[in-house]
């Protein structure tokens, strides 16, 4: 699936819920469904700066595609990073760099997050794009 196809799928899933409490529950469920991050990756260098919660992000470059794994100590943040991984993991660095992450606005996520969580979301996206830039430069 393309990045946009995945985003459209997420938009449809969130459209099934009218109440934001249900959408938060969906985020929590998504976070809990993620494979836990291997303890060896829970190191300072994998922590994302700018997040109030602790978020570890690991990126591996395999066969020209970036595979992201992550974990957070906060339930909703864990769900947010799970969404980002779902959208961006398994794509080429250039696809990630070119991606317009419109699903964030479309599902209303940005407007329903506290300012600190919103900053954390931006920090997660920035870090994923930084990995894409680095892997793109390596070719």
Report the location of each language-model feature.
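A short interface-forming secondary-structure element
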Residues: 72-73
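N-terminal intrinsically disordered, cationic/polar leader segments
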Residues: 3-11, 15-54, 61-64, 104-123, ...
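General beta-strand recognition
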Residues: 65-69
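Glycine-rich phosphate/pyrophosphate-binding loops
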Residues: 90-107
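Hydrophobic (often cysteine-bearing) scaffold residues that line and stabilize catalytic clefts
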Residues: 77
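Alpha-helical support elements that line or immediately flank enzyme active sites
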Residues: 81-91
């Amino acid at each position: 699936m393309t990045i946009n196809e995945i985003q459209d799928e997420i938009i449809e899933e969130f459209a099934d819920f009218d109440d934001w409490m249900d959408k938060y529950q969906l985020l929590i469920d998504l976070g809990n469904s993620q494979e836990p991050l291997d303890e060896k990756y829970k190191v300072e260098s994998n922590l994302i700066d700018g997040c109030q919660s602790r978020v570890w992000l690991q990126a591996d470059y395999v066969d020209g595609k970036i595979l992201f794994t992550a974990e957070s100590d906060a339930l909703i943040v864990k769900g947010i990073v799970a969404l980002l991984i779902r959208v961006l993991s398994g794509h080429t660095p250039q696809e990630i760099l070119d991606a317009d992450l419109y699903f964030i606005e479309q599902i209303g996520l940005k407007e329903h997050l506290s300012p600190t969580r919103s900053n954390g979301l931006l920090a997660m996206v920035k870090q994923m794009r930084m990995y894409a830039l680095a892997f793109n430069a390596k070719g």
